Amino acid sequence: MPNNHPWAARKNIDPKELSDEKVLLLNSGHCFSLQVVESCPDLSKKGEVLQGNSLETIRNMVASNLGITVLPKSATSDRYQNHLIKVIPFIKPIPSRTIAIAYRKSFVRMNAIEIIAEAVRLIKTDTIEML
């Protein structure tokens, strides 16, 4: 949210509170937007929802005071910091998502799949929890 938003001093937010806010999401049909709407079902019923093409575009829209957004935790790390916005986590239970590597049984380059899976396992960050 923008630094000047009334909630900017809060430690956390209940997803239900987003229903009365102008919320910026990725374009409809994007899997992350669908997950946000599933986590905040009242969002599209009451509040105004605007769309952007990328998380970076949405982050800049928030910095310009056009609304607030929900970001995946991986998009809130230090390398994405912007002094014009404030990141505030949801209350527990914090919504999460599961991502998997899927491939056909007949896929002939299993070595490529194993290398990708190993690369994901080697990622050292608190934004990913391996199952």
Predicted regions and their residues:
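Alpha-helix boundary recognition
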Residues: 16-20, 41, 62-63, 80, ...
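Beta-alpha-beta core module
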Residues: 10-11, 17, 57-106
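A local structural motif
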Residues: 40-49, 84
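Short beta-strand-to-loop elements that line the ligand-binding cleft
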Residues: 25-26, 45-54
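Flexible hinge/capping segments at coil-to-helix
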Residues: 1-23
